[in-house]
């Protein structure tokens, strides 16, 4: 018989840097998860993606066991990395802070494809371009 789901916890944690300290520890503690077990598993699974923010969905079962699924980093994080900037524009309609190429947008769209609700890479590219525009980035090409 399948285990009964008690809770679902969604977090965004830097890859390879999950620690029992806030904000990760308290969120997991409230759900009744073995914090050290989760942090070791998460850090091992995301060690190759250092420097990126990784969304994770943790499913907690009634017997306090858990499993988790890591997602691809948010498009905004990938765009900032591609453009080499710390943050987007405060006024995206008037102040453009960076430029990304179509090739960079396509690469990000292909990376994000498994998590996006898009039929093909073209649709995913349009989503990523929209995110770029809302951050004050110019898309060239």
From Swiss-Prot:
Signal peptide coordinates: none
GO CC annotation: cytosolic large ribosomal subunit
MF-aspect GO terms: large ribosomal subunit rRNA binding; structural constituent of ribosome
CDD domains xref list: Ribosomal_L11 (cd00349)
PTM description: One or more lysine residues are methylated.
Key words of the record: Methylation, Ribonucleoprotein, Ribosomal protein, RNA-binding, rRNA-binding
Example GO BP: translation
Gene3D superfamilies to which the protein is assigned, alphabetical: Ribosomal protein L11, C-terminal domain, Ribosomal protein L11/L12, N-terminal domain
Cited NCBIfam families: L11_bact
Purpose of the protein: Forms part of the ribosomal stalk which helps the ribosome interact with GTP-bound translation factors.
Quaternary assembly: Part of the ribosomal stalk of the 50S ribosomal subunit. Interacts with L10 and the large rRNA to form the base of the stalk. L10 forms an elongated spine to which L12 dimers bind in a sequential fashion forming a multimeric L10(L12)X complex.
Family membership noted in the UniProt record: Belongs to the universal ribosomal protein uL11 family.
Protein name (Swiss-Prot/TrEMBL): Large ribosomal subunit protein uL11
Species of origin: Latilactobacillus sakei subsp. sakei (strain 23K) (Lactobacillus sakei subsp. sakei)
Lineage of origin: Bacteria, Bacillati, Bacillota, Bacilli, Lactobacillales
